[in-house]
């Protein structure tokens, strides 16, 4: 049974840590609406940080940083998992990230994570993952 989590309005880091923990525990997880997840903070600072990550290194040698919102979320989750060990490799195989809602998951009930809601923010400034991706040049 796949647990479907709706990423709409959820904080990126809190969503990622919750998904990572559950995947390591053996759950199959699908995150839909990844482009609607939010990153808290000043818009210019957040976009500057992601631009710097994207421009690091060289095209040939890396490090390679994604542009698409589903790939950015998966990379964030990967940072919270021991992805080079067998346990982490298996956990990463149990995670699926989608932009929007795919047809095969549209009929299933979605979960949300109350601890990860943007309503918890004291400071209302935030940027959606879709806006970051568009800024980086993604065409999703």
From Swiss-Prot:
InterPro entries tied to this protein: Ribosomal_uL13, Ribosomal_uL13_bac-type, Ribosomal_uL13_euk/arc, Ribosomal_uL13_sf
A GO biological-process term: negative regulation of translation
Cross-referenced CDD domains: Ribosomal_L13
A family per Pfam: Ribosomal_L13
A Gene Ontology cellular-component term: cytosolic large ribosomal subunit
UniProt cross-references to HAMAP family, sorted A to Z: Ribosomal_uL13 (MF_01366)
Family that this chain belongs to: Belongs to the universal ribosomal protein uL13 family.
Biological role: This protein is one of the early assembly proteins of the 50S ribosomal subunit, although it is not seen to bind rRNA by itself. It is important during the early stages of 50S assembly.
Quaternary structure annotation from Swiss-Prot or TrEMBL: Part of the 50S ribosomal subunit.
Annotated protein name in UniProt: Large ribosomal subunit protein uL13
Organism this protein belongs to: Methanospirillum hungatei JF-1 (strain ATCC 27890 / DSM 864 / NBRC 100397 / JF-1)
């Amino acid at each position: 049974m796949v647990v479907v989590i709706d990423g709409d309005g959820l904080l990126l880091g809190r969503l990622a840590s919750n998904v990572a923990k559950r995947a390591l525990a053996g759950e199959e997880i699908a995150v839909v609406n990844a482009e609607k997840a939010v990153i808290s903070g000043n818009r210019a600072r957040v976009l500057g940080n992601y631009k710097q990550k994207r421009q690091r290194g060289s095209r040939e040698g890396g490090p390679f940083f994604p542009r698409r919102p589903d790939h950015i979320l998966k990379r964030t989750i990967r940072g919270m998992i021991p992805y080079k060990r067998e346990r982490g490799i298996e956990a990463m195989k149990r995670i699926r990230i989608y932009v929007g809602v795919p047809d095969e998951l549209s009929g299933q009930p979605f979960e949300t994570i109350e601890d990860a809601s943007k309503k918890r923010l004291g400071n209302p400034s935030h940027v959606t993952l879709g806006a970051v991706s568009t800024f980086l040049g993604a065409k999703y």
